[in-house]
């Protein structure tokens, strides 16, 4: 499975976990050099799973908050802890 943004493969792996309609990739499968931590919002701080959003930056073009990872997931979301999910701007398939 691949995560693609504007013809750029951000992540690729067969080791995918699906939760809530989103596909989560292991960090080892993600082009981390294209991700920059986004500043946390009040809503982010309220998330019970310790969410951290990332901007995807490719070729100097910033796509704000298009990726996220749960840093401290509660039991129901533990299988996706430390894995990256992507918003609808990113095609996953």
Describe each model-derived feature in a short phrase.
Residues 1-93:
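Terminal leader/tail segments of proteins
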């Amino acid at each position: 499975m691949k995560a693609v943004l504007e013809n750029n493969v951000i992540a690729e792996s067969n080791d995918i976990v699906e939760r809530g309609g989103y596909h989560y990739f292991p960090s080892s499968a993600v082009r981390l050099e294209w991700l920059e931590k986004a500043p946390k919002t009040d809503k982010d701080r309220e998330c019970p799973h310790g969410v951290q959003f990332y901007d995807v930056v490719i070729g100097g073009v910033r796509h704000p908050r298009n990726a996220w990872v749960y840093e401290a997931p509660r039991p129901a979301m533990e299988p996706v802890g430390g894995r990256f999910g992507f918003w609808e701007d990113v095609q996953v398939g």
